[in-house]
C-alpha cells in the first residue's frame, strides 16, 4: 500500500450528478427534464393538492365538525407531575409558576398517570375518580 494508492471503498462516495453539461455526459441539454411542458421550466410545478383545474379533493369533501376555542383554557396535570412538584398545597397559580400548565389555563384536572406518595392538598383543581382515590390514599385532599 502506498499513499498515492489510497482511495475510498467502492460505493462509499456518492458524487453529485452534474446535469446540463454537454451531450457526452449522458445527461446534458434537457438535463433529465424531457422536452417542453410545465415541469421542464424553471419554477414550473403545481401547488400541493392542485389537480389540473379539476375541483380538488379538499374542496369536494364537506366540512366536518369544529375545534372548540374553549379547549385552550383547559389543562391536565398527572399524578407523577404533582409528585415531582414537591409542594404540599397546590392551586392554579402554583401550577402556572411551575410551568405545568399554560398561562391561559383556567380549569385544571388531575389525571391518574403515575403514582403519588406525598400528601398534597389541592384547591380549585378537579381530579378524575381514580386520581381522587390515589390522592386521598396518600393522605391528601381536594377542596
Swiss-Prot record:
A Gene Ontology cellular-component term: cytosolic large ribosomal subunit
Gene3D superfamilies according to UniProt: 3.100.10.10
InterPro entries found in the cross-reference section: Ribosomal_uL15 (IPR030878), Ribosomal_uL15/eL18 (IPR021131), Ribosomal_uL15/eL18_sf (IPR036227), Ribosomal_uL15_bac-type (IPR005749)
Segments of skewed composition (Gly residues): 21-31
Entry GO MF terms: rRNA binding; structural constituent of ribosome
Keywords tagged on the record: Ribonucleoprotein, Ribosomal protein, RNA-binding, rRNA-binding
A Pfam short name: Ribosomal_L27A
Record region (Disordered): 1-59
GO biological process: translation
Subunit note: Part of the 50S ribosomal subunit.
Function comment: Binds to the 23S rRNA.
HAMAP family for this protein: Ribosomal_uL15
Recorded family membership: Belongs to the universal ribosomal protein uL15 family.
Protein name (Swiss-Prot/TrEMBL): Large ribosomal subunit protein uL15
Species for this entry: Albidiferax ferrireducens (strain ATCC BAA-621 / DSM 15236 / T118)
Amino acid at each position: 500500500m502506498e499513499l498515492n494508492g489510497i482511495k475510498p471503498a467502492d460505493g462509499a462516495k456518492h458524487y453529485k450528478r452534474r446535469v446540463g453539461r454537454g451531450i457526452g455526459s449522458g445527461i446534458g441539454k434537457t438535463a433529465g427534464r424531457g422536452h417542453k411542458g410545465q415541469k421542464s421550466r424553471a419554477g414550473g410545478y403545481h401547488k400541493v393538492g392542485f389537480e389540473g383545474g379539476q375541483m380538488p379533493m379538499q374542496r369536494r369533501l364537506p366540512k366536518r365538525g369544529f375545534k372548540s376555542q374553549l379547549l385552550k383554557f383547559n389543562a391536565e396535570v398527572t399524578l407523577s407531575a404533582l409528585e415531582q412538584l414537591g409542594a404540599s398545597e397546590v392551586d392554579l397559580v402554583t401550577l402556572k409558576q411551575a410551568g405545568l400548565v399554560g398561562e391561559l389555563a383556567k380549569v385544571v384536572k388531575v389525571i391518574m398517570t403515575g403514582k403519588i406518595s406525598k400528601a398534597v392538598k389541592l384547591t380549585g383543581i378537579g381530579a378524575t375518580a381514580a386520581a381522587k382515590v390515589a390522592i386521598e390514599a396518600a393522605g391528601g385532599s381536594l377542596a
